[in-house]
Curated annotation (Swiss-Prot):
UniProt entry keywords in alphabetical sequence: ATP-binding, Cell membrane, Membrane, Nucleotide-binding, Sulfate transport, Translocase, Transport
Subunit structure: The complex is composed of two ATP-binding proteins (CysA), two transmembrane proteins (CysT and CysW) and a solute-binding protein (CysP).
Primary role: Part of the ABC transporter complex CysAWTP involved in sulfate/thiosulfate import. Responsible for energy coupling to the transport system.
Catalyzed chemical reaction(s): sulfate(out) + ATP + H2O = sulfate(in) + ADP + phosphate + H(+); thiosulfate(out) + ATP + H2O = thiosulfate(in) + ADP + phosphate + H(+)
Any one GO CC term of the record: ATP-binding cassette (ABC) transporter complex
CDD domains per the UniProt record, alphabetical: ABC_CysA_sulfate_importer
Protein's recorded name: Sulfate/thiosulfate import ATP-binding protein CysA
Gene Ontology MF terms: ABC-type sulfate transporter activity; ABC-type thiosulfate transporter activity; ATP binding; ATP hydrolysis activity
Length: 357
């Protein structure tokens, strides 16, 4: 079932939580609402679910306006960060709950409920746990049960609010891959809220980056990571190095170095900032080109197969971070105090007007 969000705004007192949100989600798509705390992502999710009312705008499922339809009639499955399992019910009873409380005319038989719950527990790899209680389960297991319970009522749309936020890193990584596989099998339209960039990039078909109640950018994980539409998106989706200078006719002048800025070839003499990812900075012992920038190594540390090198730009108080392989690090044979040259391999230059939403 597709979702259409048209001109949705929401205000709490003087706080503007959402401003004129427009978003179309095709049937079967897995969309991540990504942003920092206070960006409006959870408010938008709750409005889609019917748990909150928009001040302006409309919510439609498959073209049908559901703005004034109660949450219980929207056929939505909801999974929260903290599981929200009933402590006094065992796993089977938790998963079966949504089916058992249906009005009599719509309630499946006891046999059908048992068959459905058994099938779902197998699906979420929790068969054999039917008689256990939430307190006897790990965080990852509880979240699987919460998802099974949401799927039991056969929702048309699945909404997940920071579903893995309370779990440790390893379990979180396992569960998000499992969720992706589960989604591909069910093909149910799904929207999940997260502030974890890696999670969104790893799981979603499309990412909606939100900031201060507005949508900054929408696109595939590759699009938003490789082609950020604004400084905020660039900065939010991973570490970045900044080079401040002046933009003039397609060049950013950073001290005595010129960096290419072809997208600004018609701009004359304005402030600009070049954004460069750590893995797009190369390091050499000697100056290899005119756009190489002298810097002093201040610190380095290895994380798995990658070495992070912190450097201080020559003649400034600005620090840079480069990300290189262990093999490159061995070949360079650098240590703290060494003067080297860094060269940006991929650069995105923003001017003041780009910093306005």
């Amino acid at each position: 079932m597709s979702i259409q969000i048209q001109g949705v705004s929401k205000q709490y007192g003087t706080f503007q939580a959402l401003t004129d949100i427009h978003l179309d989600i095709p049937k079967g798509e897995l969309v991540a609402l990504l942003g920092p705390s206070g960006s409006g992502k959870t408010t938008l999710l709750r409005i889609i679910a019917g748990l909150e009312e928009a001040d302006e705008g409309s919510i439609s499922f498959e073209g049908e306006d559901l703005t004034d339809i109660h949450v219980k009639n929207r056929q939505v499955g909801f999974v929260f960060q903290h599981y929200a399992l009933f402590k006094h019910m065992n796993v089977f009873e938790n998963v079966a709950f949504g089916l058992k409380v249906r009005k009599k005319s719509l309630r499946p038989s006891a046999e059908a409920i048992e068959e459905k719950v058994t099938e779902l527990l197998k699906l979420v790899k929790m068969d054999g746990f039917a008689k256990r209680y939430p307190a006897q389960l790990s965080g990852g297991q509880r979240q699987r049960i919460a998802l099974a319970r949401a799927l039991a009522v056969e929702p048309k749309i699945l909404l997940l609010d920071e579903p893995f936020g309370a779990l440790d890193a390893k379990v979180r990584k396992e569960l998000r891959r499992w969720l992706r596989k589960l989604h591909d099998e069910f093909q149910i339209t799904s929207v999940f809220v997260t502030h974890d960039q890696e999670e969104a990039l790893d799981v979603a078909d499309r990412i909606v980056v939100m900031n201060e109640g507005r949508i900054e950018q929408m696109g595939t994980p590759e699009e938003v990571y490789e082609n950020p539409a604004s400084p905020f998106v660039y900065d939010f989706l991973g570490n970045v190095n900044l080079f401040h200078g002046r933009v003039h006719k397609g060049k950013l002048n950073v001290g005595s170095v010129e960096l290419e800025a072809p997208e600004h070839k018609h701009i004359s003499n304005v402030d600009g900032v070049a954004y460069v990812r750590p893995h797009h900075l190369s390091i050499s012992r000697t100056k290899q080109s005119v756009d190489a920038i002298p810097a002093k190594v201040s610190y380095s540390h290895a994380v798995g197969p990658v070495v992070y090198v912190e450097l201080k730009r020559d003649g400034t108080d600005e620090y840079l971070e480069a990300e290189i392989s262990k093999e490159q690090f061995r070949q360079l044979s650098i240590q703290a105090g060494d003067v080297v040259y860094v060269q940006p391999k991929e650069v995105k230059v923003f001017i003041p007007e780009d910093f306005v939403i």
